[in-house]
Amino acid sequence: MQRPTPHHNNRRSDRLDLTYCDRPERPLNCATAMPSLTLKYAYFPGCVAQGACGELYQSTAALTKALGIELLELKKASCCGSGTFKEDSRLLEDTVNARNIALAEQLNLPLLTHCSTCQGVIGHVDERLKDFQTSDPAYLNQINGLLQKQNCSPYQGTTEVKHLLWALVTDYGLDELQKRVTRKLSGLKCAAFYGCYLLRAQKTIPYDDPYQPESMENVFRTVGATPVYYPGRTQCCGWPLSSYATDQAFQMAGNHLDEAIAAGADCLVTPCPLCHLNLDSRQPEVAKFMGHKLDLPVLHLPQLVALALGIPPKALGLDRHVVSTRSVLEKLGL
């Protein structure tokens, strides 16, 4: 059964409610494992992982708990807008996400997200506002004035916006991750689908090459899987077109799936839930549009890593996908 697609509320700034700024944060999980590193983040799950892609929220919780990473969920955070707020107002996008970042700053923690779109949008806003501290302080004062009217903390530019992928690779470290592997994913051929927001929404990405990335492939190798390369792994999935140019969105998704299948992939793995919606949830429609069978499982990054840590598939929501993940599990003897 197909999952509902997410939608955004009216983007008019006069309907934006930022007034619930006094609710306490709550820990999503506590660090029960004892790795050599102790990591703690202000966790921004985004709206898709709490709705249409609930298995991403579920698997992130399972993975971080197993690794001993503590997440303090930002329950007061707003949807980042996934790039749509700026169509109405750049000030709206900047103010909403300045507030999201300020919530993490209050905790003196990096803001962690498992959504490439959230990373791209919030990370880009953070980059812009840090520049404005010297290049356009009046604009930044305008944003902080709007936040003050809603009894919200000001943006200070004192933290970092970081995707879960980069936290695993650069903070936790692949050597540490390898020590936690209890079930090597030997023989599983994984094709990374980075998409566009993670790599190119910001001017500077210190963790990977925006055009020839390797961070996901390095994670695959660490957990015993085999990386598969194909041309479209860093291109847009087509999701932004899905509401007004459906055929083009289906064509883009179909091309990527065809390329991964032709390269011998057993599954696609993505760090973005919106990419997952277009490549998994809509894959039956994409296959119908393309005129041929696809049936390529699409996993969220934390699901794949968590499998290698011995976490049961059901605890990772692998039964929630539109395209069955059974072929992946059978290949792993599960």
What are the language-model segments listed below?
Residues H7-N10, D14-D22, N29:
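Intrinsic-disorder-associated, low-complexity terminal segments enriched in Asp/Asn/His/Tyr and depleted
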Residues R3, R26:
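Cationic, low-complexity basic patches in intrinsically disordered or flexible, solvent-exposed regions
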